[in-house]
Amino acid sequence: MRKVLDEPFGNPSSGHWAGRPARVAVENARNEISNFLGCKPQEILFTSGGSESNNHALKGVYFASGKPNAQIITTYIEHPAILNPCRFLEGLGAAVTYLGVDHFGQVDPDNVRRAITPRTVLISVMHANNEVGTIQLITDISKIAREHGILFHTDAAQSVGKIPTRVGELGVDLLSLAGHKLYGPKGIGAL
């Protein structure tokens, strides 16, 4: 990591000689992450961290829907990086449904199904909870989202690198991660 932070000084988006090594480093990282997550390299958007990734997922889907009263389904146990953008979107007219959990911290997929309305554009449920360790039934929830044609996001900052987190197997459309949670530097994330 130190080598990458110290040596390729150029802007990876520039076309000149100083940017080329940085561009190679970024693309190598993109390929490694895509192999690790089981997705295509072009599906990875690098961000400044997990919070920015979550903001892009929530706000991006909401604004792209074109529905000012669109519904987002999430849970009460989400990280503030999910809850705060949801509150922001509520201020703009979004309907955010917050689901409770059982005594193990588990979201009941049937409660997700019951919360869906014709206005639902996104379901966002964290993969693993950092406080109680609960691993959510993401594949079950993703099937429900698919049945209804709804996009599904999971904040996987706490799970990536600790448990299998393959995008295709989970069935998610959007997955957020934070670099510092898996031996990367602070200030790096991906969606």
Language model feature labels by segment:
Residues 1-191:
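Pyridoxal 5′-phosphate
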